[in-house]
Amino acid sequence: MKVVAIQPDVPIAEVERSLVHLEDLIGQAAREHSPDAIFLPESMTTKNVYDRRMREVARPIDGAPLQMLRRAARAHDCVVGGGFIAIRGNDARGTYAVVEPDGTALFHDKDQPSFWENNYYSAGTDDGVIDTSLGTIGIANGFEWGRTRTARRMLGRVRLLAGGMHFPSFPTWKATKPWFWDRDHFALVQYARETPPRMARLLGVPAVHPSHVGDFVMETMLVPGLAWPSLCVGESAICDADGVVLQRLGFDDGEGWVCADVDIDAEPRPRDPMPPGFWNSLLPISVHAVWHVGNVHGRVKYEGMKLLRRHRWQQ
């Protein structure tokens, strides 16, 4: 099966502009490769950052992002997947849609928002296993790629792992450069690069890992007025079931796409043992610190705004 992973560089919270651009990228990749499936990252409509403009990005589940995916799937006669913040009943979710050429759409809601994402949407409850015309696919959004519980709920049940990533790095502040940038940024890039093959080996199936790329400036949690200049690291990849990287795009490659043939007919055969912990690999202490602070801060703010009906999607 021929699959494409698209690595986009989209602006913050310019949903309609980004959708036009993404549809063009899908078209270019489809015309070049005639693939069976094309996958975009999670939160394809915006960089998934901490910024007041993010209050504007949630769209109805059947709104413009899904309609773009449907147009693309029909136009290019292939499965197309991409993520966006969707209004799902009384909540917003980090949703990933996989759309068939006939317009049928299947969804996965991210099981746990990461860091500041908790400000903008809440946790989903489905297992991320979907049955498509191509076979049974597992969908992982963002840091779901890094958690053992993602692999455990898909183990032996899927023939391909797809979905996508948004992997921002540390701020480039001069005062913290020796620690955050010169040391931990490098560790994060390595982690992002190793994540798709690691999950492929844990599940024993091929993996398609599209990811955001490009510079951005966001706000800083709990420090009003302090800008957080940084970047999304890229590291989009397509791997086989042994974790061999067939195609890859790093930060220096910028926006683009890669294509590879993967075998989804073979029975899943895990190559690596399942780690016992929450994460499937080690992360810097600084990431854990931002993780815990961001999770608590975001959940409290999300639920408080929901109670007061202050979210834009509640208006």
Residue ranges and their predicted role:
Residues V15-E16, V20-P101, L106-H108, P168-V205:
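Cys-nucleophile CN-hydrolase/nitrilase-fold catalytic domain and related Cys-dependent amidase chemistry
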Residues I61, I87-E194, D252, P273-P276:
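Active-site catalytic loop in hydrolytic enzyme cores
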Residues V129, P206-Q315:
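C-terminal beta-strand edge segments of enzyme domains
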Residues I61-G81, W145-G256:
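CN hydrolase (nitrilase-like) catalytic-core segments centered on the catalytic cysteine
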Residues V10, T45-T46, R147:
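Active-site micro-motifs of SAM-dependent methyltransferase domains
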Residues M1-A5:
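Extreme N-terminal starter segment of soluble prokaryotic enzymes
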Residues Q7-A13:
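Short polar catalytic/cofactor-binding loops
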Residues I6, V99, A140, V208-P210, ...:
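Short hydrophobic segments within beta-strands
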